[in-house]
Regions:
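Acidic, Mg2+-coordinating active-site environments of NTP-dependent enzymes
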Residues: 73-79, 187-304
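Conserved beta-strand segments of alpha/beta enzyme cores
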Residues: 15, 83, 134, 240-242, ...
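Phosphate-binding loop of NTP-binding sites
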Residues: 12, 92-240, 298-301
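Structural signal for conserved beta-strand scaffold positions within catalytic alpha/beta enzyme cores
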Residues: 29, 44, 69, 86-87, ...
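N-terminal leader/targeting and accessory segments in enzymes
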Residues: 1-96, 256, 283
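Residues that form or flank phosphate/diphosphate-binding pockets in enzymes
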Residues: 37, 50-54, 120, 146, ...
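Thr-Gly-centered strand-to-loop micro-motif
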Residues: 43-46, 137-139, 164-165, 280-281, ...
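ATP-dependent carboxylate-amine ligase
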Residues: 1-16, 36-41, 136, 210, ...
Length: 304
C-alpha cells in the first residue's frame, strides 16, 4: 500500500527539502537491507554506536532519493533530485508513520509480549493459523522500538491477521509499541529476569508489559502465576480473559492433565466445559507453556 512523499511529510510534520515526486512502498533503517531504491524511504537513526546519516551518500549512489533526517547533508547541492524530510527525532517519526499506516487496517492483530517465548509463540501461531488466513508477522525477533514499526509496515491489503512481538527494556517504552501494533488479542508469555536492572520491581515490569493490551478484546496468560494474575487484576482490562490454569477448573481454559513421554507431551484440557487433548513433540516445560498460549488463541478464533 503505497503512500506519497507529500502524505509522509504531513504525517511527520517535517520540514521538506526537495520537490521530487515519490511513492513510498518500503521503509529502511539498515542500508544493508536495501532492495527497491526508488520506492524506499530511509530513516537516518542515531544511536550510541552508530549514525544513519553517514550512510546517506552510499544509499544515494544506490538510487535512494527519499530520506528522513535530523541533520541535512552539508553538501546539499549534491542531492538536488532527492527529498529530505527533516525533523528533530527520526525514530519518533518512524513510529508515527507506522502508527498511521497501521490505522489503515481493520483486521485482528495478535500482540505478544513477555520475558521469554515471544518468537516461538509467534512462529507456532503462524504455523497453526496460516492455512486458514493470510498472515503478516514480525520477521525474526523484530520487537524493539525500531523493529515493531518495520514489522507493521509489512502489512498489505491482503493481510487478514497480524502477529507481532513487542519487547521492552525499560519503563515507558510500551506506550509507543501499543499505539503501533494496536492488538486485539494479547498474549503475555511470562515474566522473567531479562532487563530487570531497568525496572524497580518484577511487578513494575509486568505492569509495563501489560500496557500493550489496553485496547485488546481478549488477553491470554497463565492464571497460576499469582504475580501475573495480580497485575492483570490491577490493570482493570475491559477485555475478556482467557486465563489458562492447571489448578482452577473455573478458568475458561482448564488443563486437566499433562503427560510427558520420552519425546512427546500430551495435554488434556477443557475449554468452556468441552474436553479435548493434543500432543506436541517436546517435553520441556517452556514448550508446554508456549503451546498453551497458542491453544488459547486457536480456540478463541474458533479453529478445530
Amino acid at each position: 500500500m503505497r503512500i506519497s512523499i507529500e502524505n509522509v511529510t504531513n504525517i511527520l510534520n517535517a520540514n521538506r527539502v526537495g520537490s521530487r515526486n515519490a511513492e513510498i512502498d518500503w521503509i529502511l533503517t539498515d542500508s544493508r537491507s536495501l532492495c527497491f531504491a526508488e520506492e524506499t524511504l530511509f530513516f537516518a537513526l542515531k544511536s550510541k554506536r552508530n549514525d544513519g546519516h553517514k550512510y546517506i551518500p552510499e544509499l544515494y549512489d544506490r538510487g535512494v532519493r527519499n530520506f528522513v533526517v535530523s541533520d541535512l547533508p552539508k553538501e546539499l547541492e549534491h542531492y538536488s533530485d532527492a527529498n529530505f524530510l527533516q525533523l528533530a527525532n527520526p525514530l519518533k517519526g518512524l513510529q508515527r508513520l507506522a502508527e498511521k499506516y497501521r490505522a489503515r487496517f481493520d483486521v485482528p492483530v495478535v500482540g505478544i509480549t513477555g520475558s521469554n517465548g515471544k518468537t516461538v509463540v509467534k512462529e507456532w501461531l503462524y504455523q497453526l493459523l496460516s492455512p486458514e488466513r493470510i498472515i503478516t508477522r514480525s520477521p525474526r525477533s523484530y520487537n524493539s522500538q525500531i523493529g515493531v514499526p518495520l514489522s507493521v509496515w509489512l502489512m498489505t491489503e491482503r493481510t487478514e491477521l497480524g502477529i507481532f512481538e513487542a519487547g521492552i527494556s525499560e519503563m515507558g517504552e510500551m506506550e509507543a509499541l501499543q499505539s503501533i501494533i494496536r492488538p486485539s488479542i494479547g498474549i503475555l508469555t511470562n515474566i522473567g529476569g531479562a532487563h530487570q536492572e531497568n525496572f524497580y520491581s518484577v511487578t513494575d515490569k509486568c505492569m509495563e508489559k501489560l500496557a500493550l493490551f489496553k485496547e485488546c478484546d481478549v488477553v491470554i496468560y497463565d492464571a497460576d502465576n499469582e504475580m501475573i494474575s495480580g497485575c492483570v487484576s490491577k490493570s482493570l482490562f475491559g477485555a475478556r480473559e482467557i486465563a489458562w490454569s492447571r489448578k482452577d477448573d473455573d478458568r475458561p481454559l482448564y488443563i486437566e492433565w499433562i503427560k510427558k513421554g520420552e519425546k512427546t507431551t500430551t495435554i488434556r484440557y477443557r475449554y468452556l466445559g468441552m474436553p479435548n487433548e493434543y500432543t506436541i513433540p517436546f517435553i520441556d516445560d517452556a514448550s508446554v507453556e508456549n503451546s498453551l498460549h497458542c491453544l488459547a488463541v486457536a480456540l478463541y478464533m474458533m479453529l478445530p
